[in-house]
């Protein structure tokens, strides 16, 4: 399958839409990344909410623009709340995104993620090892880290997309986004982004938000990857290391939104 490139004009158009619609994103994400995820969404103009109580999660999924399910710090009570939210999202036609953190390394979350696939996510975002494991190609990864190159996961991503109907994102040195029939590659970013906890998880939240936008969902999701890589490059140019990267990254996201409004 040919891998196309996303144009800067497409990315800018989607960011303009993002700012106009300001999606309300219900983030059922892991404990390690909640603040960074919320700040990333805010910097881009979205509205984050972290609602985890089972009864509230179901109720909120019905009114949110989009739902994120991230299994990074999964527990049985949290799985119950996530299941309720996903069931309600399907009923309410709220697009939801799955981030199958470490799905290839741990059995409980692998079974849980496979169960959730029956509720038809709008998007799935993971590293190469996670996507390959979720597709049943291989069980791999070193915890949350990948042991495979993103390009090697393209066939698995295409299969997973066709089987689930989801837009599948494989992140790495190059991000690949596919609906099973088309594929887009997004270059850029910097290795320093892997030295900060939460950049991938925050991307999943932005992907979730983009699934709520009008237009071509594949292009919208690919645009999310492009913004994060752009902001990463800008932040690295101003940073001395991981500690100073985070505030510069959030500033860079904010600046991107200001540029498309100018």
Curated annotation (Swiss-Prot):
Cofactor: Mg(2+)
Binding site for ATP: 125, 171
UniProt cross-references to InterPro entries, sorted A to Z: Hyethyz_kinase (IPR000417), Ribokinase-like (IPR029056)
Domain of life of the organism encoding this protein: Bacteria
Biological process annotations from GO: thiamine biosynthetic process; thiamine diphosphate biosynthetic process
Gene Ontology MF, one: ATP binding
Signal peptide interval: none
Enzyme Commission number: 2.7.1.50
Pathway in which the depicted protein is active: Cofactor biosynthesis; thiamine diphosphate biosynthesis; 4-methyl-5-(2-phosphoethyl)-thiazole from 5-(2-hydroxyethyl)-4-methylthiazole: step 1/1
List of residues binding substrate: 50, 198
Coiled-coil regions listed: none
Swiss-Prot/TrEMBL keywords: ATP-binding, Kinase, Magnesium, Metal-binding, Nucleotide-binding, Thiamine biosynthesis, Transferase
Catalytic reactions on record: 5-(2-hydroxyethyl)-4-methylthiazole + ATP = 4-methyl-5-(2-phosphooxyethyl)-thiazole + ADP + H(+)
Keyword 4Fe-4S carried by entry: no
Keyword Translocase recorded: no
Family: Belongs to the Thz kinase family.
Name listed for the protein in its UniProt record: Hydroxyethylthiazole kinase
């Amino acid at each position: 399958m040919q891998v196309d490139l996303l144009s800067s004009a497409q990315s800018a158009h989607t960011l303009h839409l993002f700012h106009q619609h300001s999606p309300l994103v219900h983030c059922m994400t892991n404990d390690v990344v909640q603040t960074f995820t919320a700040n990333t969404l805010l910097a881009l103009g979205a509205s984050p909410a972290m609602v985890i109580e089972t009864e509230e999660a179901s109720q909120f999924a019905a009114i949110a623009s989009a739902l994120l399910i991230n299994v990074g710090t999964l527990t049985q009570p949290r799985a119950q709340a996530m299941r309720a939210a996903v069931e309600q999202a399907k009923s309410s036609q709220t697009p939801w995104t799955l981030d199958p953190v470490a799905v290839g390394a741990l059995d409980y979350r692998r079974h849980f993620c496979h169960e959730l696939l029956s509720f038809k996510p709008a998007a799935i975002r993971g590293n190469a090892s996670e996507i390959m494991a979720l597709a049943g190609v291989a069980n791999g990864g070193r915890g949350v880290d990948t042991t495979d190159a993103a390009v090697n996961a393209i066939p698995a991503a295409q299969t997973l997309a066709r089987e689930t109907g989801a837009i599948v994102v494989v992140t790495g040195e190059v991000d690949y986004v596919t609906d099973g029939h088309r594929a887009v590659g997004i270059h850029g970013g910097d290795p320093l982004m892997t030295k900060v906890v939460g950049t991938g998880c925050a991307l999943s939240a932005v992907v979730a938000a983009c699934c709520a936008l009008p237009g071509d969902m594949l292009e919208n999701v690919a645009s999310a990857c492009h913004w994060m890589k752009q902001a990463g490059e800008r932040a690295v140019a101003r940073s001395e290391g991981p500690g100073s990267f985070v505030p510069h990254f959030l500033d860079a996201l904010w600046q991107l939104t200001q540029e498309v409004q100018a």
